[in-house]
């Protein structure tokens, strides 16, 4: 700045001199005339002035021109001051200059006489040269000042105070950061002092020559030198790394001065710490970039590998001393070999680092050594540093040199030097000398692990010691990110991933909330590396140990919960991060981990992805505030009642549609258009654009007026109604009077409008022409008076248009905004009226002429409004349809079989919505896509399950333009339709309409298809009760169109539960959701029917062959009828089946007197079913209509979804489908064995994934076996064997079934590379496989009755396991003869024998499965892995480990449950005055653990895995525990007394019926928690009488079966 000031002064002086020169030139001409007169007077003055001028002129070259000019000015002023007292200062200045130049010229004039030429000539040259220099300097200064002003322009800022405050804050932050760097740099002294103190203490105390390592206290100094100074890094490698980073950053940027400073510091690394007043990030080598961090990590890896490859190490092992020894050895090797240092090529190639010796060998400069000597006395004897190769072990002579150059020698030397300072005595020196004689320690894995654990712990402590000294949050975040990057590079082989997660957890607690997004961004960048290292640790280091896998996963879950809390606390909440963290869990954790199965699945975390949707709405729509009307609030409150929503919508459309369309919707629609098209423009730009559009529209309307006038005249002539016209003429006269009054008001407006509107000036020319025409009209008034009668007739034709006119005029007067479009028309009309005021007699004629003009204008206006109203009506109706669609998607359970007609309403609403979407213009969509704000906002609605946000008009207008949202919405509708189709059985696979639609082009194959349908109906695997109303085949894959991947239609359940006309059973899962009391009645009906069916099934096999023959004869007769009349009406089929069913039941009742009551109930139900079938005749038309609607609905949806090119929605499809399936499994309170998993295949658009099909129903319940065998059957039937007899067909079927069963597990092989969604799908498969494998284990091994009574075991297996043989016997009695039945029974016996022979295989599987499930339940109980983590000490053997594993479940968990009981007792005792908040009952963790412990002790492990949870009510569980312990004790007492003596006399049928009754009573107790004890006491009396006939093993006495408890209770 000083230089600038000096240059500015010089510039001023130069400018003054130039001005003086110009003035002097003008004066010269005047002075030449008076030369002779001035000679004598001024000769004396010339010599004096010359001397002064020469002196001043010489000084100007060295000094500033300002001072010289001032001196001359002062001297001249002083001399002339006495002469000219009264004159001004400026005149004196001019005169002095004139005198000076006059003297010069007089002197030159006299040169000829005196001979003083050379001196004056030289003086003139100097003057000219000075002028040239002045000009150059002036130009240079001018350029410099222009550059300065261009670079440092001052901004016109109104709020200077705010800028000053922000500048002050920035300065404070910079000062804080600088102080933090100073603290970090000055921390070296602290680490060195601690190292000296600890080393002296340890060396003097531990004198014993044992093989134990002393704790190393030199890590802090070592880490400081490495991480902050970079002492041990190679110079060339570091320079090359910094160059790479600068190349990446400065590809397009120019090098600035700061960057030059950085390059200089990178060249002189050793001199960084000597810089003063530059405590920046360049002092810390961690912040040099990722390449320098990679060098640091490579050095640490090399050092740890070298320690591992050593043979021996001293007991007093210090890393600093070890590094110094390595460097001394490398120096000697360098002298011998004299190798040149290699150039660092790639820091990421770790293989080359092991091969090249000097790649990691670090040679320091002499400057570094001097610095270390001055700073650290430890490095007084140190020289240049190098590293050692890991691959080459040390030879024997070098080991001897190592033992001679032990670290103790160095320590003794240092102690002798610092004896006076530290106060060391001779005794201490003797002790340290004795330590030299200690034995060396051989390195083992155990010792190396200790060194490595100490390394990790010291590294962690070093990190946090540095972080404690930091106060600025930015710098703290930067340290955390860099340190976590270093730990990530060192994992999993050098830093254990458990320790890494612990470090990350500590970082997560420390990091500030505002900067949490940067920390998560680090994981987003390094996601793949983190997952790879996690899996490498899992497979290579742990070797897939289930206990350790669960514990590590639990810690990772804890870390992610910490981050999620920080995200929720942040004001600028971004739910994308929480969604990312949950997906990272789903990819890291294995499929079998409990945290992945339970809560951290992607299924339950999609709402985190769009949690800030409301915030976005409030931010983006500041002008249009989101305010919910009463209509919207009513919809939100009544969203579950579809009928109420329908009535509200109808009421709104009928009553408030006009108000809404005219007032609210027009404003909102215009605002939405403008916001979408011009988002960034202000209010002014929007107003201007509206005006431009209005003027364009007015120009177009004038051209169309003539055409519309002609059309109106024609319509007027056609609509001549004389009676009505006379009445309307009277009304027109009244209206004309009103119009005259309005003209007066309009005249005033015209005067104002002429001043305002600039565009009317252009139209004055047109108005003048019209005025000329008006003058002609005045002359023709007399002629027109005679023709008034003709005009009145014409007016009557236009009365229909006048009615529209009056309505529009009222709107024009009230709404000035609408008049802006038509101001030009009104002004023209006003001019007509102003000229005709005087002629009152001729007013009628003028009015009639004016009416024609106005009607033409108004008709155009009404047409425009009609178009706008059309748009608003469509938008409004589409909004109403959108609400109904959203309600339909959110709660599909509303629609039942009684309310199927509501599907038509949904379809109509879909049509209106789709038509509105297709009618939107492409330009608006493109403009909308360009706006990033709205796109970011709309992403919030893709997976959002909440409706409250969607029920708003403003948001609806935005969502309509987004294709992603529409894709999601239409796919959700498709899923709901298929869901309802599965449940309500609307569209079945082979209806006549579908066959016709699919086989239009295949007329030749119709007969073959009919035959195949008949054959398939003969070979159905369902019971006789499962016959359809429509007579269709049931087991073919659902294929209707080539897009069959989306159309998963109904395949009737192959279970024994559904009956023909039982509406309660069809819709019990839907009605069960309504009320809990209604659930009980449903369960009673279900279980009565199950008990009756089980009795029928048991009697069917034990009876004689007479019943079977009767059944076969009756069914053969029926099947002959069905073969002939396959495509007939449904009523005949129903009647025939029902009558035959009656006869069969009567035959069974004659043989079995025990089951009379049950069979009577069934007959009573079947008579009701027949009546219900007759009632179905009235509803048959409705069903056909709904079928057509469903097919068209699904086709339109699929056509829309196929229009999208992007395949990103495949992930979304899997999520949505799985959500509805799991929703049904978990929410439906239904104790049946129905197969709810639908065989659903996804369409793969990507070419790489064409062959993949995600099947959910590969391994569900046993019903899938029937599905798969049925597909087998159909494949065989479609071959050339269709001409064979029915008997041969049956034989092939049975052979296929028996051979097919063992091949089922082959389909469950999982691929290696699975997506997170595919892992979610596989969870269900894994747990269902466990259930399947455990059923035969219990049936064959647990019950003693089975081993004794083999004949009765068959029936038990057939009922419990639902074997295929029973289904075949009951369903295919149409064709089976006695001989064939014998063959079937032989196959059944073989199957049962095979299951009994395969007990060893089941036992082997169970041993593994048992361990698998135990590990899952362990993590349920305590995620910290308190009891089940094994000790790491070497003393434990494998046998002890196995024993401890067994004790975990049996002893420790039960003891833990007893402790929980005691805590509840303490809470409930009135003596102990404990507040409710402090009670352990209210702790959610306590509730969770108690429920899981309860399940482990009292309920079987393997029945809970899939979808059966328990309550967390502590008091309820406590009462159940007490009652169950009493029951167990009573059972033991009964068994010990030997009450049960005759095991063979037990009836299996009675046994089953009693168990079903128990289940009914216990399942009724789900909602009655208060009366649990009373109901269980009543249960005891019944169980004591019933359980006398039961014998079980002692293990089952401890663990009760799940039938004794209500299982389907959901967690609160």
From Swiss-Prot:
Coiled coil segments of this chain: 23-52, 1338-1362, 1444-1469, 1553-1601
Disulfide bridge map:
none
**What is the protein's given name?**
Uncharacterized protein PFD1115c
Subcellular compartments? Membrane
Polar residues bias spans: 375-394
Superkingdom of the source species: Eukaryota
Q: Where is this region: Disordered?
A: 46-94, 369-400, 698-777, 992-1037, 1091-1157, 1257-1291, 1554-1612
Give start-end positions of Low complexity composition bias: 996-1028, 1102-1140, 1257-1271
The primary site where this protein sits is: membrane
Q: Where is the composition biased (Acidic residues)?
A: 1567-1597
The UniProt Biotechnology section states that this protein is used in the following way, namely: Possible candidate for an effective malaria vaccine as determined by epitope response in sera.
- According to Swiss-Prot or TrEMBL, what is its membrane topology? Single-pass membrane protein
Q: Which residues cross the membrane?
A: 479-499
Enumerate the UniProt keywords alphabetically.
Answer: Coiled coil, Membrane, Merozoite, Transmembrane, Transmembrane helix
**What ranges does the record list as Basic and acidic residues composition bias?**
46-93, 708-777, 1554-1566
Q: Gene Ontology cellular component?
A: membrane
């Amino acid at each position: 700045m000083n230089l600038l000031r000096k240059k500015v002064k010089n510039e001023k002086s130069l400018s003054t001199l130039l001005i003086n020169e110009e003035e002097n030139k003008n004066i010269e001409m005047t002075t030449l005339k008076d030369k002779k007169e001035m000679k004598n007077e001024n000769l004396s003055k010339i010599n004096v002035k010359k001397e002064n001028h020469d002196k001043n002129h010489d000084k100007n070259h060295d000094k500033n021109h300002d001072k010289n000019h001032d001196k001359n000015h002062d001297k001249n002023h002083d001399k002339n001051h006495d002469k000219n007292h009264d004159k001004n200062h400026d005149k004196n200045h001019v005169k002095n200059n004139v005198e000076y130049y006059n003297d010069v010229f007089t002197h030159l004039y006299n040169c000829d006489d005196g001979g003083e030429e050379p001196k004056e000539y030289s003086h003139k040259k100097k003057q000219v040269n000075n002028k040239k220099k002045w000009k150059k300097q002036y130009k240079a200064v001018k350029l410099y000042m222009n550059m300065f002003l261009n670079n440092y322009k001052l901004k016109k800022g109104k709020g200077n105070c705010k800028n000053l405050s922000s500048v002050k804050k920035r300065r404070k932050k910079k000062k804080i950061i600088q102080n933090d760097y100073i603290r970090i740099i000055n921390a070296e002294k602290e680490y060195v002092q601690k190292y000296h103190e600890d080393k002296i203490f340890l060396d003097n105390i531990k004198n014993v020559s044992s093989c134990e390592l002393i704790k190393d206290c030199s890590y802090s100094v070592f880490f400081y030198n490495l991480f902050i100074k970079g002492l041990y890094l190679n110079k060339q490698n570091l320079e090359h790394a910094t160059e790479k980073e600068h190349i990446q950053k400065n590809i397009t940027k120019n090098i600035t001065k700061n960057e030059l400073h950085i390059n200089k510091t990178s060249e002189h690394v050793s001199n960084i710490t000597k810089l003063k007043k530059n405590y920046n990030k360049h002092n810390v080598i961690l912040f040099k970039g990722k390449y320098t961090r990679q060098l640091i990590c490579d050095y640490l890896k090399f050092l740890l590998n070298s320690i591992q490859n050593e043979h021996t190490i001293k007991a007093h092992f210090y890393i600093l001393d070890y590094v110094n020894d390595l460097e001394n050895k490398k120096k000697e090797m360098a002298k011998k070999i004299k190798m040149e240092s290699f150039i660092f090529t790639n820091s990421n190639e770790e293989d080359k680092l092991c091969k090249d010796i000097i790649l990691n060998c670090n040679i320091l400069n002499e400057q570094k050594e001097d610095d270390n000597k001055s700073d650290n006395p430890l490095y007084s004897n140190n020289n240049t540093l190098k590293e050692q190769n890991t691959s080459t072990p040390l030879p024997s002579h070098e080991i001897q040199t190592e033992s001679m150059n032990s670290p103790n020698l160095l320590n003794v030397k240092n102690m002798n030097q610092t004896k006076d300072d530290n106060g060391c005595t001779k005794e201490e020196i003797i002790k340290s000398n004795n330590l030299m004689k200690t034995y060396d320690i051989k390195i083992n894995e155990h010792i190396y692990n200790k060194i490595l654990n100490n390394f990790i712990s010291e590294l962690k402590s070093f990190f946090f010691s540095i972080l404690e000294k930091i106060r600025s949050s930015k710098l703290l975040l930067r340290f955390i990110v860099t340190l976590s990057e270093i730990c990530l590079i060192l994992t999993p082989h050098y830093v254990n991933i458990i320790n890494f997660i612990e470090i990350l957890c500590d970082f997560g607690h420390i990091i500030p909330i505002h900067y949490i997004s940067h920390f998560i961004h680090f994981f987003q960048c390094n996601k793949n590396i983190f997952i790879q290292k996690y899996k490498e640790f899992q497979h290579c280091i742990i070797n897939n140990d289930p206990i350790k896998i669960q514990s590590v996963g639990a810690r990772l879950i804890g870390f992610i919960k910490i981050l999620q809390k920080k995200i929720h606390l942040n004001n600028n909440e971004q739910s994308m991060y929480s969604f990312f963290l949950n997906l990272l869990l789903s990819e890291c954790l294995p499929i079998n981990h409990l945290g992945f199965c339970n809560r951290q699945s992607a299924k339950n975390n999609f709402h985190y992805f769009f949690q800030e949707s409301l915030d976005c709405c409030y931010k983006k729509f500041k002008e249009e505030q989101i305010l919910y009307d009463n209509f919207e609030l009513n919809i939100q409150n009544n969203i579950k009642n579809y009928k109420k929503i329908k009535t509200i919508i109808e009421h709104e459309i009928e009553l408030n549609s006009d108000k809404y369309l005219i007032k609210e919707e027009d404003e909102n629609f215009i605002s939405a258009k403008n916001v979408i098209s011009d988002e960034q423009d202000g209010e002014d730009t929007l107003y201007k654009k509206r005006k431009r559009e209005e003027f364009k529209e007015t120009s177009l309307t004038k051209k169309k007026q003539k055409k519309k006038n002609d059309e109106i005249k024609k319509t007027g002539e056609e609509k001549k109604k004389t009676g009505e016209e006379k009445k309307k003429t009277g009304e027109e006269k009244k209206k004309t009077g009103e119009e005259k009054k309005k003209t007066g008001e309009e005249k005033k407006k015209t005067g104002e409008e002429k001043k305002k509107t600039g565009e009317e000036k252009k139209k004055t020319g047109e108005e003048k022409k019209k005025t000329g025409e008006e003058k002609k009209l005045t002359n023709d008034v007399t002629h027109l008076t005679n023709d008034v009668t003709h005009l009145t007739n014409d007016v009557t034709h236009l009365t229909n248009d006048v009615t529209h006119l009056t309505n529009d005029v009222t709107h024009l007067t009230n709404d000035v905004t609408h008049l802006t479009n038509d101001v030009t028309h009104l002004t023209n009309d006003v001019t007509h009226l102003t000229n005709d005021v005087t002629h009152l007699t001729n007013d009628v004629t003028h009015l009639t002429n004016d009416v024609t003009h106005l009607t033409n204008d108004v008709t155009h206006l009404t047409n425009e409004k009609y178009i706008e109203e059309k748009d608003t009506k469509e938008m409004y109706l589409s909004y109403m349809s959108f609400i109904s669609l959203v309600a339909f998607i959110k709660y599909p359970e509303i629609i039942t079989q009684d309310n199927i007609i509501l599907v038509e309403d949904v379809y109509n609403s879909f049509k209106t919505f789709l038509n509105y979407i297709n009618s939107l213009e492409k330009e608006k969509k493109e403009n909308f896509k360009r706006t990033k704000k709205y796109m970011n906002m709309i992403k919030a609605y893709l997976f959002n399950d909440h409706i409250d946000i969607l029920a708003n008009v403003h948001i609806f207008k935005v969502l309509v333009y987004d294709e992603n949202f529409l894709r999601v919405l239409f796919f959700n509708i498709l899923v709901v339709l298929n869901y309802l189709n599965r449940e309500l059985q609307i569209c079945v696979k082979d209806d006549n309409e579908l066959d016709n639609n699919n086989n239009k082009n295949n007329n030749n194959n119709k007969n073959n298809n009919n035959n195949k349908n008949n054959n398939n109906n003969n070979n159905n695997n369902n019971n006789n009760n499962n016959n359809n109303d429509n007579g269709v085949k049931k087991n073919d894959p659902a294929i209707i169109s080539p897009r069959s991947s989306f159309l998963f239609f109904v395949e009737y359940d192959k279970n024994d539960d559904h009956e023909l006309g039982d509406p309660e059973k069809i819709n019990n899962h839907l009605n069960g959701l309504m009320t809990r009391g209604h659930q009980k009645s449903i369960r009673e009906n279900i279980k009565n029917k199950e008990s009756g069916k089980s009795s029928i099934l048991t009697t069917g096999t034990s009876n004689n062959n007479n019943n079977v023959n009767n059944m076969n004869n009756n069914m053969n007769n029926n099947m002959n009828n069905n073969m002939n009349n396959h495509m007939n009406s449904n009523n005949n089929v129903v009647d025939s089946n029902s009558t035959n069913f009656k006869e069969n039941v009567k035959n069974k009742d004659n043989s079995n007197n025990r089951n009379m009551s049950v069979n009577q109930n069934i007959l009573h139900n079947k008579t009701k079913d027949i009546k219900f079938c007759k009632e179905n005749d009235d509803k048959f038309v409705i069903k056909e209509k709904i079928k057509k609607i469903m097919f068209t609905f699904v086709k339109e949806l699929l056509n829309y979804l196929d229009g999208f090119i992007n395949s990103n929605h495949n992930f979304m499809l899997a999520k949505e489908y799985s959500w509805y399936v799991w929703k049904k499994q978990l929410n439906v309170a239904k104790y049946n064995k129905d197969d709810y998993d639908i065989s659903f295949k996804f369409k793969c658009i990507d070419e790489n994934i064409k062959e993949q099909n995600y099947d959910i129903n590969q391994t569900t319940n046993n019903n899938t076996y029937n599905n798969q065998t049925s597909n087998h059957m159909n494949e065989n039937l479609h071959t050339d064997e269709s001409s064979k007899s029915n008997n041969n067909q049956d034989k092939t079927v049975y052979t296929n079934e028996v051979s097919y069963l063992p091949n089922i597990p082959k389909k469950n092989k999982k691929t290696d590379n699975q997506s997170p969604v595919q892992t979610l799908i596989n969870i269900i498969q894994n747990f269902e496989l466990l259930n399947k494998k455990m059923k035969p284990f219990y049936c064959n091994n647990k019950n003693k009755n089975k081993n004794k009574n083999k004949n009765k075991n068959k029936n038990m297996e057939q009922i419990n396991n639902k074997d295929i043989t029973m289904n075949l016997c009951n369903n295919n009695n149409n064709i089976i003869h006695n001989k064939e039945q014998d063959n079937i029974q032989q196959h059944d016996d073989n199957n049962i024998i095979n299951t009994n022979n395969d007990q060893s295989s089941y036992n082997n599987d169970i041993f593994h499965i048992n361990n698998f499930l135990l590990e899952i339940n362990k993590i349920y109980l305590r995620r910290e892995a308190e009891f089940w983590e094994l000790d790491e000490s070497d003393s434990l053997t494998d046998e002890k480990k196995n024993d401890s594993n067994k004790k975990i479940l049996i002893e420790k968990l039960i003891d833990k449950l007893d402790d929980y009981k005691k805590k509840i007792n303490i809470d409930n005792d009135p003596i102990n005055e404990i507040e409710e908040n402090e009670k352990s009952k209210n702790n959610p963790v306590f509730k969770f653990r108690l429920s899981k412990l309860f399940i482990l002790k009292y309920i079987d492990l393997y029945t809970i895995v899939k979808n059966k949870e328990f309550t967390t009510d502590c008091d309820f569980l406590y009462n159940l525990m007490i009652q169950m312990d009493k029951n167990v004790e009573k059972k033991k007492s009964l068994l010990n007394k030997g009450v049960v003596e005759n095991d063979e006399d037990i009836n299996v049928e009675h046994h089953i019926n009693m168990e079903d009754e128990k289940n009914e009573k216990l399942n009724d107790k789900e909602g009655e928690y208060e009366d649990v004890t009373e109901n269980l006491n009543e249960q005891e009396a019944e169980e004591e009488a019933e359980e006398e006939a039961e014998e079980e093993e002692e293990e089952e006495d401890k663990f009760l079966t799940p039938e004794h408890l209500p299982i389907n209770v959901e967690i609160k």
